[in-house]
């Protein structure tokens, strides 16, 4: 059963940002760079109108409404990325062995984690920059998903299994996402 006669989600395009829609591809160009993404769902139309990106569907079902709002959120994140960018902050925590972290090419190398001889590695996705400042790691970029995945890769590289995590709290943890502190 359709939920309504139609759904129409609008995303405002701010000044200095150019959005072009070609078929299912949406390109967003701004002062920090350019992002391109494909959005496809049967029956959903995406177009620009009066300085807005419009996501439209006739006689939507519940799933169609959810997908239309998801597309709108992704486009909002693309616009925010090319205007402001996204920043994640991670903190290096250790009590037993001092951890050393360095960036080498498209990988983050974590050495001496829990006294291990072999270094652990975390992949940096394309379009993301990683800076190490003492015990703080800053991950920046314009694509929210790539920045978040890179931060998660770094955090997961130091995940401890089979040991009591209440005692062995060494690792690298995300402490701030997009300017908002993470509480534990």
UniProtKB/Swiss-Prot annotation:
GO terms classed as biological process: cytoplasmic translation
Keywords: Ribonucleoprotein, Ribosomal protein, RNA-binding, rRNA-binding
Classification via InterPro entries: Ribosomal_uL6-like, Ribosomal_uL6-like_a/b-dom_sf, Ribosomal_uL6_a/b-dom, Ribosomal_uL6_arc, Ribosomal_uL6_CS2
PROSITE patterns xrefs: RIBOSOMAL_L6_2 (PS00700)
GO CC aspect terms: cytosolic large ribosomal subunit
One term of GO molecular function: rRNA binding
Family the UniProt entry places it in: Belongs to the universal ribosomal protein uL6 family.
HAMAP family in alphabetical order: Ribosomal_uL6_A
Role played: This protein binds to the 23S rRNA, and is important in its secondary structure. It is located near the subunit interface in the base of the L7/L12 stalk, and near the tRNA binding site of the peptidyltransferase center.
Name of the protein in its database record: Large ribosomal subunit protein uL6
Species classification: Archaea, Methanobacteriati, Methanobacteriota, Thermococci, Thermococcales
